[in-house]
Curated annotation (Swiss-Prot):
Function noted in UniProt: Catalyzes the isomerization between 2-isopropylmalate and 3-isopropylmalate, via the formation of 2-isopropylmaleate.
Quaternary organization: Heterodimer of LeuC and LeuD.
GO molecular function, one term: 4 iron, 4 sulfur cluster binding
Gene transcribed to yield this protein: leuC
Protein name: 3-isopropylmalate dehydratase large subunit
Length: 420
């Protein structure tokens, strides 16, 4: 019996030929990640160990992205605390202020995470890096403390579920719609503690941006990780960014899967995830007219340059966003911001009446920079729509792709791009 890509990566980091689903392992890690919300506790727990040095100052990433720019005294104190730790241990990958980007867009862009890696992050959307053909998963702050001390992490090898993506995409359909459709199909626990492996003919036509979006939301189906088979598209993205050597792993043809889903992607239309679960999905065309108060285009899910290009192309047609809709544009990283500036995208957004933000997680977690009041509704390109996720518990959040978000900003209700 062969092995899956996830099993191969984990085995290689355990110094073993094979690992089996259900086996408890302690693989060596390539990157331990934390942010301004989770790092303070990780640092405190690390110090409790009595260990004087981190295992490798080049294999730790601390990204102060959630409340940047610091929204209050407490967030400023947290960042100061982590900054001092980073200086003390000479952490190479420390990002704050004008250098900071949303972590799950920033690390691949910088080449800090590469194919074949094992990555642990104190953030549930760490599964994003599987788009590169890496094993990446979220953990708690105490897990990161242990990883910073030992260079290893302890967990159980997951079973794998394979999603074979077939046919071609309809107009205005993107990676966001694929993953929303899949989550709607299997539910928020449909891949609980399983590796979600994406393969099939369509994958070779998906951009890296689409792949990052898909793996980013694997956790919304309960997945331990999401992962793509690396290919030429991966190579073209990684080769010019990687800060170190990398390796492509590919599942064996006779690898064992818990389940296999064949997804006819030609049947997928632009999706909307209704409150209050990512699995509560419908086609945009099938929902009743839903007026909104805010649109957010950004996040680790859809804040890349490709996403902003799509949004700008639609907003340019409509010329102005609806006067009743606060429209927030949040480039995921400084590089994305700079590129959007050079391409004239930010001018399109500004002329349309949108708000341009510095890179931040801000509204996605209900932190700041776009909080919802009681009864308000928001169409957002983010990844979660639990009750109270973006503000008041009586607000409502609808997850959509950038094209639908842009169209909705113009029309004032959740709309198809074809309406513009």
């Amino acid at each position: 019996m062969g092995n899956t890509i996830t099993e191969k990566i984990l085995a290689s980091h355990c110094g073993k030929k094979v690992v089996e689903p259900g086996e408890f392992i302690e693989p060596k890690i390539d990157i331990a990640l934390s942010n301004d919300v989770t790092a303070p506790l990780a640092v405190k727990e690390f110090r409790k160990t009595g260990i004087k040095k981190v295992f490798d100052k080049n294999k730790i990433a601390l990204v102060m992205d959630h409340f940047t720019p610091n929204k209050d005294i407490l967030s400023a104190e947290h960042v100061k605390f982590v900054r001092e730790f980073a200086k003390e241990h000479k952490i190479k990958h420390y990002y704050e202020g004008g250098n900071v980007g949303v972590e799950h867009a920033l690390l691949p862009e910088k080449g800090i995470v590469v194919p074949g890696d094992v990555i642990i992050g104190a953030d549930s959307h760490t599964c994003t890096y599987g788009a590169l053909g890496a094993f990446s998963t979220g953990g708690g702050s105490t897990d990161i403390a242990a990883a910073m001390a030992t260079g290893k992490i302890w967990f159980k090898v997951p079973n794998s579920i394979k999603f074979i993506l077939n046919r071609k995409l309809n107009k205005w359909v993107s990676g966001k719609d694929i993953i929303l459709y899949i989550i709607g199909l299997i539910g928020v626990d449909g891949a609980l503690y399983n590796s979600m492996e994406f393969d099939g003919p369509l994958c070779k036509k998906l951009t890296m941006a689409d792949r990052f979006t898909i793996t980013n939301m694997a956790i919304e189906a309960g997945g331990k990780n999401g992962i793509f088979t690396p290919d030429e598209i991966t190579e073209n993205y990684v080769a010019k960014r990687a800060q170190r050597k990398y390796k492509f792993y590919i599942s064996d043809k006779d690898a064992k899967y818990l389940k296999i889903y064949e997804i006819d992607c030609s049947k997928i239309l632009p999706q909307v995830s209704m409150p209050f679960l990512p699995s509560n999905t419908k086609a945009v065309k099938d929902i009743k007219k839903t007026y909104i108060d805010q649109v957010v285009i950004g996040s680790c899910t859809n804040g890349r340059i490709e996403d902003l290009r799509v949004a700008a192309s639609i907003i340019k047609k409509g010329k102005k966003v609806n006067s009743n809709v606060r429209t927030l544009i949040i480039p995921a990283t400084p590089e994305v911001y700079s590129q959007a500036l050079d391409e004239g995208l930010l001018r399109i957004f500004m002329d349309a009446g949108a708000i341009i933000s510095a890179p931040t997680c801000g509204p996605c977690l209900g932190g700041h920079m776009g909080i919802l009041a009681s009864g308000e509704k928001c169409a957002s390109t983010t990844n979660r729509n639990f009750r109270g996720r973006m503000g008041h518990v009586e607000s409502q959040l609808f997850l959509v792709n950038p094209a639908v978000a842009a169209a909705s900003a113009i029309k004032g209700y959740i709309a198809s791009p074809d309406e513009i």
